[in-house]
Amino acid sequence: MARGRVTVLGRAERTGDKRQIERFLARHEEARGYATFKDFHFYRVAPTRAHLVAGFGRIHWIEGGALLCRGNMDALSNAESEILAHMNADHGEALALYAERLLGLAPMPDSKPWRMTGIDPEGLDLEAGGVTARLGFDQPVLDPDAARAELVRLAKLARSRQAGSDSE
């Protein structure tokens, strides 16, 4: 194992928070049919610390608070479902450009288009045909206006690149 790896330790806490449930289901559509079963429950992990192996001789323990986003992300979190709905309904081309030109992923067939499944201060999550991807932001975004500006910036950057090019 030459690559770095991290193990997150924490408390699993049952949750009924509708936003957390919708975030999970956006990423795991196949679970939606089971979500209303009486024996199906949702949990969140409250990190207490993490064990990082960053390479040979580079092993560290990290406190849980250092794993969490700094700053108030309530505004972005409250708007996440609307941002996802808007991007997926109106900006499918931009999502494909993010995946193909910024992340270097293969084009997907029209029957399985890229869709945004999440957004948080550090980046956005994409999914298409069972393939998932993460596109990080250069700077944290904490509210819908900052998210919009970053999504527009990324779309312009992606459009400026030739298909298959690495240059910015």
Give each language-model segment a name.
Residues M1-G33, F37-F40, P47, T132:
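Short, structured beta-strand-loop surface elements
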Residues A35-E168:
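C-terminal edge-of-domain segments
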